[in-house]
Amino acid sequence: PTALPDIEISSIARVSTTFGEIDRVLGGGIVPGALMLLGGDPGIGKSTLLLQVSQKVADTVGTVLYASGEESQLQLKLRAERLHINSERLQVIADTDLDHILEQADAMTPSLLVIDSIQTMYTGDIDAAPGSVSQVRECTSRLLRFCKERNIPTVIIGHVTKEGNIAGPRMLEHMVDVVLYFEGERSYQFRILRSIKNRFGSTSETGIFAMVEEGLQELSNPSASLLAERSDEESGSAVIIYLEGVRPILVEVQSLVVTTAFGMPRRTAIGYDLNRLIVLLAVLEKRCGFTLGNKDVYVNVIGGLKVNEPACDLSMAVAIVSNLKNRIVPTDMVILGEVGL
């Protein structure tokens, strides 16, 4: 054992990914010897994100080993060309045998090891199929031991279930040092990197990206992108300040109110809680005297974001009344406030 005061801080200096948004979420960069888990829906951009991070680390720090059990080397090359990635220090291996991958990593001593994905890996010591609980547990345990002994930071990609949880044993999240979720709607360009667990930093920071043709582009000022196409000549639009972690973001909310053609009016919410919308409409009708019982009401949060803060109630109510009365909300106005009964 080593006395705590004798441990040099320089020995745990962080490695920057040169992605400001990712470094923000990680607490300043990658900690050597850390085991990190990245989860997210299929097709959301997890592999794209880690390929771009691998390129940056390879260019600025040293060799990176990217091990894929889901794509061949040719498929990885095609993806890399689309992302304009062509670094000689980025080494790729297409294999599902974790023992062989760790042998290669031990010989190379890379500055970063990426496993894509943990559900495709297996070890011959366990008599079970890849992706099973026992295989995922054992493979993660070996990766944890390897990265701690060699002081090599390692990122593993994990699939998620229909409920949004990372597939595999629950203890998987307890074994790793950092758990990140990559979220967003596939039909929208915005992506959010969220920290669920971080032994080396805060879990209240988020990173925001846009999926473009060349890959993921970090957004240091997401408010400008979210409000870029807002019209100042249309009613039913308002701006809120939405807290994503500890990060305030300006977001546009929209509303459309039309006379219903059926007996029961429709209430539809995209990115906003439907129950809160129903409460808002009841308050507007009872307390403010607006007739909404014969109106279909549709509300939407721009960018595919989901807002669930009570402080967004008032801006949504203003957007609804704005469209109902065809009155335009000033573009330089931000509306905040919780609406009670």
Regions found by a protein language model. Name each.
Residues 42-44, 70-74, 82-85, 96-100, ...:
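Conserved nucleotide-binding/hydrolysis micro-motifs of P-loop NTPases
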Residues 1-29, 121-129, 217-220, 227-233:
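P-loop NTPase nucleotide-binding/switch module
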Residues 11-13, 39, 65, 87-95, ...:
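Flexible beta-alpha connector loops of hexameric P-loop NTPases
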Residues 205-340:
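Conserved P-loop NTPase/AAA+ ATPase motor core
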Residues 25, 76, 116, 158, ...:
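Residue-level signature of catalytic and energy-coupling elements of molecular machines
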Residues 2-83, 102, 106:
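The Walker A/P-loop phosphate-binding site
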Residues 59-129, 134:
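Nucleotide-state-sensitive switch-loop elements of NTP-binding domains
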Residues 144-231:
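Phosphate-binding/switch region of NTP-binding enzymes
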